[in-house]
Curated annotation (Swiss-Prot):
One of its GO terms (biological process) is maturation of SSU-rRNA. NCBIfam families: rbfA. Pfam families: RBFA. Signal peptide: none annotated. The gene is rbfA. It comes from Streptococcus mutans serotype c (strain ATCC 700610 / UA159). GO terms for molecular function: ribosomal small subunit binding. This is Ribosome-binding factor A. The lineage of its organism: Bacteria, Bacillati, Bacillota, Bacilli, Lactobacillales. Gene3D superfamilies: 3.30.300.20. Belongs to the RbfA family.
Length: 116
């Protein structure tokens, strides 16, 4: 399957999941979750959904992960209504560490700048 189609489907799923989390999922554990990326498998049967949250607390991270797993059925059902795909991919939610990593590097650079 063409990479262009895989990327398009991933972008569409990202947009839809963000909207579903904001409008359809009422679980307070997933409030403030932002979907940052979706990586699709080559056959479009699996989607790795990367997310961030505003809190740095480990307990909040765990609560969000549990909330997303509980909401997975609702999210897939809504994706089925909104997307014209034969089969909706299985969703795997993964916390996106790249923003925290970038913030850590920025802080290290600021600390170096202060020393000089």
């Amino acid at each position: 399957m063409s990479n262009h189609r895989i990327e398009r489907v991933g972008m569409e799923i990202k947009r839809e999941v963000n909207e579903i989390l904001q409008k359809k999922v009422r679980d307070p554990r997933v409030q403030g979750v932002t979907i940052t990326d979706v990586q699709m498998s080559g056959d479009l049967s699996l989607a790795k959904v990367y997310y961030t949250i505003m809190s740095d607390l480990a307990s909040d991270n765990q609560k969000v992960q549990i909330g997303l797993e509980k909401a997975k059925g609702t999210i897939k059902r809504e994706l089925g209504k909104n997307l014209t795909m034969y089969k909706i991919p299985d969703l795997t939610f993964i916390k996106d560490e790249s923003i925290e990593y970038g913030n850590k590097i920025d802080q290290m650079l600021r600390d170096l700048e202060k020393r000089n």
